[in-house]
């Protein structure tokens, strides 16, 4: 272990495992929603907040935690984040009620916000510019592995045990990463220690909280009044005003110690990549949200089968990402990224065309393989191009900005696509219910149509259970169940197709935006000064080899 301490690839392995945990918890909980509703006696709103509490805290605090890494050291923040995340995971697993689980998920989001930006920052510091593509290729492969492990591992654990084990699974990983961090990751100094911009932290956190809360809860309140004079539009206005004040305050502080150094955006590639990261997050989450519902609710796949159905795409991404990383180091990321985004959009577009009411998993295979080729050629060149010219002393701030744009993009994608899907479902389910209801006795027709009109607001899907009066013949009950399943499947598919036009279009916009990138030279020169080696001291800091 002593020989491996400070080795860039050993450090990368530890960072990647920590990053893996945070991504795993963004996907694994979705599979457990039905089990939580049953075992925890939770409402649908409770379970949705179990999902949103994690994402909301992560989106709000990741930019601040990135800057804290510059202040206190990336290793210190990474280790603290691992500890918080692991303890919160155990607390989630033992949560006695929905309220406690939501609170512990928020703490888990805090841990993820503490460690996530440090992974990107430390990779930027310990690897020279001409080798970062290979490093980010491994990092991207880990992201692909997490997309597999989330639905698949979640399905296995929920099937074998119950929802609590989707949190307990983090414990051995977290403990292992915590120990390995002290053994393998040296303290890293990147130059003069900055001061923390407290007013900036307060303004940024308040602005992001208001905007993200409005996006997360907007659909719940039909984008209107919450209580009294408080409404979703008012929360948005407050968030936008606070964001404007934050940006003005940051501009005024550029000569001192701002939370976001505007010097980062002098790099055209960094600016463009943040835009692409945001649009890609909107597109990817917007694509997979309706498609996952389709697999489980329309086609009747189990949680495990749904995860396995998506596995071919993720496997292609895992295999391809390291290769793309090395290729990015040689020729730059511009055209690789454009090709990857285009292939991903083509794959998802063909997936929409092939998806039908009676599709099987192998009908999706060609489309998923194309999308996997595109996805594998996306994350590595995106991150490498964005971070190539970032000075090591600003790596934490840059990583915080990148992760914030991604998380906010995910929140926007979830809210926008959720609202659009609900709108289209209200039309298509009502139309299908009216069509199928003609086969029912007259007294059952209106309640049947009304039930499906209301079911459009329940995005976890499935045909609504019929409320049958006493004495209903068994044959009629069976016919209602058959027509209900047929109505939902035939109504959901066109709603999904119409909805997915939006996120696929956003991915196309991301691909077109790459025309604005500057293509890197074949042997790029890092514009940043090299990191200042730390001296061994009380924190165990040692020099980090650059090559």
PLM regions with names:
Residues 7-58, 62, 100, 162, ...:
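Transmembrane core module of solute transporters
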Residues 20, 52-56, 83, 137-145, ...:
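Transmembrane alpha-helical cores of Major Facilitator Superfamily
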Residues 36-37, 68-69, 153-161, 215, ...:
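Interfacial helix-cap and linker-helix signal at transmembrane-aqueous boundaries
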Residues 64-208, 213, 217, 229, ...:
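Helix-loop-helix hairpins in multi-pass membrane proteins, especially solute transporters
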Residues 149, 155, 293, 364-452, ...:
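Small-residue-rich alpha-helical segments with characteristic i,i+4
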Residues 179-198, 218-221, 248-257, 356, ...:
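Helix-loop junctions on the cytosolic side of multi-pass membrane transporters
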Residues 407-518, 524-547:
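Hydrophobic transmembrane architecture of multi-pass small-molecule transporters
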């Amino acid at each position: 272990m002593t020989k491996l301490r400070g080795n860039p690839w050993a450090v990368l392995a530890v960072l990647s495992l920590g990053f893996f945990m945070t991504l795993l918890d963004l996907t694994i909980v979705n599979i457990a929603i039905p089990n939580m509703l049953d075992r925890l006696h939770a409402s649908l709103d409770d379970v949705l907040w179990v999902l949103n509490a994690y994402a909301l805290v992560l989106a709000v605090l990741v930019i601040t935690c990135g800057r804290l890494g510059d202040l206190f050291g990336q290793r210190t923040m990474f280790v603290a984040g691992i500890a918080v995340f692991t303890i919160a995971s155990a607390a989630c697993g033992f949560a006695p009620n929905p309220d406690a689980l939501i609170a512990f998920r928020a703490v888990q989001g805090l841990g993820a916000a503490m460690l996530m930006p440090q992974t990107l920052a430390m990779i930027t510091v310990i690897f020279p510019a001409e080798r970062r593509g290979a490093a980010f290729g491994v990092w991207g492969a880990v992201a692909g592995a997490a997309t597999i492990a989330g639905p698949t591992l979640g399905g296995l654990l929920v099937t074998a045990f119950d929802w609590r084990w989707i949190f307990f699974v983090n414990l051995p990983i977290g403990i292992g990463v915590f120990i390995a961090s002290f053994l393998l990751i040296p303290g890293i100094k990147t130059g003069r220690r900055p001061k923390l911009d407290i007013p900036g932290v307060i303004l940024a956190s308040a602005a992001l909280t208001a905007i993200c809360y409005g996006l997360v809860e907007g659909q719940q309140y039909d984008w209107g009044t919450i209580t009294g004079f408080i409404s979703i539009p008012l929360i948005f206005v407050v968030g936008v005003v606070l964001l404007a004040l934050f940006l003005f305050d940051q501009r005024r502080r550029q000569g001192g110690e701002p939370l976001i150094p505007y010097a980062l955006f002098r790099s055209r590639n960094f600016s463009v990549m943040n835009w692409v990261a945001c649009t890609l997050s909107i597109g990817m989450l917007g694509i997979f949200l309706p498609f996952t519902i389709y697999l489980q609710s329309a086609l009747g796949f189990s949680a495990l089968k749904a995860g396995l159905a998506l596995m071919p795409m993720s496997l292609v991404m895992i295999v391809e990402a390291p290769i793309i990383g090395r290729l990015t180091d040689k020729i730059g990321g511009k055209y690789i990224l454009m090709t990857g985004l285009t292939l991903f959009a083509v794959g998802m577009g063909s997936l929409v065309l092939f998806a039908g009411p009676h599709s099987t998993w192998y009908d999706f295979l060609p489309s998923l393989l194309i999308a996997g080729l595109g996805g594998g050629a996306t994350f590595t060149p995106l991150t490498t191009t964005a971070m190539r010219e970032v000075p090591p002393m600003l790596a934490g701030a840059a990583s915080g900005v990148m992760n914030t744009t991604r998380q906010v993009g995910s929140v926007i994608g979830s809210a926008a696509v959720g609202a659009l899907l609900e709108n289209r479902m209200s039309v298509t389910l009502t139309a299908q219910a009216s069509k199928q209801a003609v086969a029912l006795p007259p007294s059952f027709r209106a309640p049947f149509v009304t039930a499906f009109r209301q079911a459009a607001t329940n995005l976890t899907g499935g045909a609504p259970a019929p409320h049958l009066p006493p004495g209903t013949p068994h044959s009629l009950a069976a016919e209602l169940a058959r027509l209900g399943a047929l109505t939902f499947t035939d109504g959901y598919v066109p709603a999904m197709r119409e909805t997915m036009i939006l996120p696929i279009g956003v991915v196309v916009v991301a691909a077109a935006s790459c025309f604005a990138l500057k293509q890197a030279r074949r042997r790029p020169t890092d514009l940043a000064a090299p990191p200042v080696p730390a001296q061994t001291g009380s924190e165990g800091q040692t020099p980090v080899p650059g090559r």
